[in-house]
Regions:
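Bacterial N-terminal signal peptides that target proteins for export
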Residues: 2-13
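Bacterial N-terminal signal peptides
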Residues: 12-22
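Short beta-strand/loop turn elements enriched in aromatics
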Residues: 12-13, 47, 132-134
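Intrinsically disordered, low-complexity
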Residues: 25-57, 61-67, 72, 171
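N-terminal post-signal-peptidase region of extra-cytosolic proteins
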Residues: 28-34, 61-86, 105-109, 151-152
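Exported/periplasmic cell-wall-interacting domains
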Residues: 31, 86-171
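Well-ordered beta-strand positions in beta-sheet-rich domains
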Residues: 35, 56-58, 81, 120, ...
Length: 171
């Protein structure tokens, strides 16, 4: 009986230590992304910190994902370098992080084409009321040009990605 109690105390002590270490890691900001990388062809979003991968997510994109966004309504997800410049906790898509599209290059291209470049490109969750779809949302590209993850994933991403974080969107 004494051996059993000693073993239980050791296990409980280890669990408490691991729990405290996890809380310390979050409290000190060890898990803050300093860059986001979107690879459209791979349909992948990666959160990076000091060149190390923090998290990777499978994503859905605009319904016409090949090539860079050229105009409003083209169903394309932009390509280029941007920043996360805001968030919307009252989003129609659970929660969203705003991407600074269009940049100067995008505006110039749209002006040359005589079109609006579009706006409101976000990383977001599922349309409100459809969170139950979860990971099945990646079976096809369904957004208007945004980058979509599950509700649980955007809830995980948002606190790890401060405003001002650079995001690179590659083909």
């Amino acid at each position: 009986m004494v051996i059993f109690m000693t073993s239980c105390l050791k296990v409980l002590s280890m669990l408490m230590i691991f729990t405290m270490l996890g809380a310390i890691g979050f409290a000190t900001g060890d898990l803050t992304a300093d860059k986001l990388l979107v690879e459209k062809k791979a349909r992948r979003l990666t959160l990076l910190s000091k060149g190390q991968i923090l998290r990777t997510y499978k994503i859905a994109l605009g319904g016409n994902p090949e090539g860079p966004k050229e105009r409003e309504g083209d169903g394309k997800t932009p390509e280029g370098s941007y920043i996360i410049d805001g968030r919307n906790t009252r989003s129609g898509y659970h929660l969203s992080l705003h991407i600074s599209y269009p940049n100067e290059k995008d505006r110039k291209r749209a002006k040359e084409l005589g079109v609006s470049p579009g706006a409101q490109i976000m990383i977001h969750g599922m349309k409100n009321g459809l969170g139950w779809i979860g990971p099945f949302h990646t079976l096809y590209n369904w957004t208007q040009g945004c980058i979509a993850v599950t509700d649980a994933e955007i809830d995980e991403i948002a606190p790890l990605v401060p405003n001002g974080t650079p995001i690179e969107i590659r083909p």
